[in-house]
């Protein structure tokens, strides 16, 4: 059957710190166009590769990859909240297939996800519950991180399974591009923050969650005024990365180490591995072509903001 792919940057800062109206209208138009293409495709199943920001995954157990057999979005930063419609038996079959292919994919029957998962479902499909979804977490912030090669192999294994289903599959990648918002690091954490990163942060008191979110908002405002206050965005790298994906040259990314990527584009740029997994999964369906490429650095969102679609060819 056919597959359709869309990769999209996410940002929790939408509605909190926005760019000028002309830029906002431009981005909203890009998302609306992608949503129309997806609607015309009429997906029967969504596979969503996305990261977490210490809202569902912590250092008590931090897998490189995890498939949610059950998943709930927490609604951080006013994003959509609620259960994701995961088809249990299909998710279990997917996990077995990927593991049998040699990829050590963890599973969770109670996966907690944040805006990284919720935002693409909300923006591109109109809500969390529109289409059955297989949510796949890819660790993008908590060292040690998976590399490009292993992430690509995960995507290929997922794609081989998806191609056996006789369904119209929408493959989504969520995150990136270049950016480094104020995400905590275990090596630099004080005792309280360390406790949160080891797992107690999964159920934050409302006032603490509000303070945490306000820190990100304040950082975005500072970055808008002074782009030396955080790691700078890297449009050159972002566009090179998107071109490699469009040309199907995923394996060329394998040689880029995690430290090198962080230095080039920021420590949260590792979220782009969700895009790599998505394109690798699409490759299992045969020939494809890209469409709808968009890119703009948006300091207000602390992100090189990208959007890219691809469709299989008969």
Swiss-Prot record:
Q: What is its EC number?
A: 1.13.11.16
Q: How does it assemble?
A: Homotetramer.
Q: Tell me the NCBIfam families matching this sequence.
A: PRK13370.1-1, PRK13370.1-4
Q: What is the official name of this protein in its record?
A: 2,3-dihydroxyphenylpropionate/2,3-dihydroxicinnamic acid 1,2-dioxygenase
Family, according to the entry, reads as follows: Belongs to the LigB/MhpB extradiol dioxygenase family.
Q: Which keywords annotate this record?
A: Aromatic hydrocarbons catabolism, Dioxygenase, Iron, Oxidoreductase
Catalytic center residues: 115 (proton donor), 179 (proton acceptor)
Q: Where on the tree of life does the source sit, at the highest rank?
A: Bacteria
Which cofactors does the annotated protein need, by name?
Fe(2+)
Q: Which CDD domains match?
A: MhpB_like (cd07365)
Q: Which InterPro entries has this protein been placed in?
A: DHPP/DHXA_dioxygenase (IPR023789), Xdiol_dOase_suB (IPR004183)
- Enumerate the Gene3D superfamilies for this protein: LigB-like
């Amino acid at each position: 059957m056919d597959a359709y792919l869309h990769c999209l940057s996410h940002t929790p800062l939408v509605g909190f710190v926005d760019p000028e109206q002309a830029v906002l209208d431009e981005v909203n138009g890009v998302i609306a166009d992608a949503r129309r293409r997806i609607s015309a495709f009429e997906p029967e199943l969504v596979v969503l590769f996305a990261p977490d920001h210490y809202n569902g995954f912590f250092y008590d157990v931090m897998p490189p990859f995890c498939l949610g057999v059950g998943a709930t979005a927490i609604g951080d930063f006013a994003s959509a909240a609620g259960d994701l419609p995961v088809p249990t038996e299909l998710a279990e079959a997917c996990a077995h297939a990927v593991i049998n292919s040699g990829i050590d994919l963890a599973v969770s029957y109670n996966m907690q996800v944040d805006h990284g998962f919720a935002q693409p479902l909300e923006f591109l499909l109109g809500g969390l519950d529109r289409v059955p979804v297989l949510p796949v977490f890819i660790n993008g912030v908590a060292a040690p991180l998976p590399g490009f090669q292993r992430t690509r192999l995960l995507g290929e294994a997922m794609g081989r399974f998806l191609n056996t289903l006789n369904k119209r599959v929408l493959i989504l990648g969520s995150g990136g591009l270049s950016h480094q918002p104020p995400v905590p690091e275990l090596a630099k954490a004080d005792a309280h923050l360390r406790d949160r990163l080891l797992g107690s942060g999964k159920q934050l008191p409302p006032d603490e969650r509000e303070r945490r979110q306000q820190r990100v908002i304040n950082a975005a405002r500072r970055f808008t005024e002074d782009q030396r206050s955080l790691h700078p965005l890297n449009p050159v790298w972002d566009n090179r990365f998107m071109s490699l994906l469009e040309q199907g040259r995923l394996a060329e990314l394998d040689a880029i180490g995690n430290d090198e990527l962080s230095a080039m584009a920021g420590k949260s740029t590792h979220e782009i591995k969700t895009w790599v997994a998505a394109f690798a999964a699409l490759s299992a369906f045969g020939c494809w072509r890209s469409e709808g490429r968009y890119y703009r650095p948006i300091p207000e969102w602390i992100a090189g903001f990208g959007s890219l679609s691809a469709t299989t060819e008969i």
